[in-house]
Amino acid sequence: MFDQQRDGNLYKIWNRLCSGTWFPPPVLKKRIPKSNGKERILGIPTVSDRIAQGAIKLFMEEKLDPIFHADSYGYRPGKSAHDALKQCAIRCWRYSWILEVDISAFFDHVRHDLVLKALEHHGMPKWVILYCRRWMEAPMQSCENGELITRTRGTPQGGVISPLLANLFLHYAFDLWMEREYRGYRLRGTLMIL
């Protein structure tokens, strides 16, 4: 449907982003079963909102990615799980222990105020901060009954910009502390200290 009027739809996104009038529609709440029998909740944005998030993410990533720890591999351009495993192979010979930690429902608990404060700290323009706030606060709509759920924490797992915001949060909440205390790295929501 989006593609049938692609040029007009892209123009609307561009126009609204430039004028400050882009308001993200609710993200679709979708339950995905996990291998352990539990569920992961995804917040799936509309096609238009994914495009808008992608445009802002490209702008932000150029400025934020260079500040992230060299051993932070999750959701980073030019870095992968394979790169993290290579570092594990190199470092596992130097240490006799590994600590693995899984941050339960991490994307659901990211504090908005701390992400916005970090964006301000890095000199992100006010319009970027405005849109990041709107995306984090966008309601979630249940696909089962259409109920709208207000969100005061978290960033939708499934959003284009969410991994970058999560990495920024973890940069301050975890990576800088780890850098002072240990040599380590982070891979998505799983932490391994070597």
Regions found by a protein language model. Name each.
Residues 12, 16-20, 24-31, 35, ...:
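Conserved polymerase palm-domain catalytic core
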Residues 49-52, 61-63, 94, 117-121:
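Short, low-complexity, polar/charged sequence segments that are solvent-exposed and flexible
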Residues 2, 65, 97:
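Metal-dependent nuclease catalytic cores that hydrolyze phosphodiester bonds in DNA/RNA
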Residues 38:
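Exposed loop/turn and edge beta-strand positions of beta-sandwich/beta-sheet ligand-binding modules
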Residues 41-42, 46:
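Conserved phosphate-binding loops in nucleotide/dinucleotide-binding enzymes
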Residues 1-7:
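Non-catalytic, polymerase-adjacent accessory regions of viral genome-replication enzymes
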Residues 47-57, 89:
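Duplex nucleic acid-engaging cores and interfaces of nucleic-acid transaction enzymes
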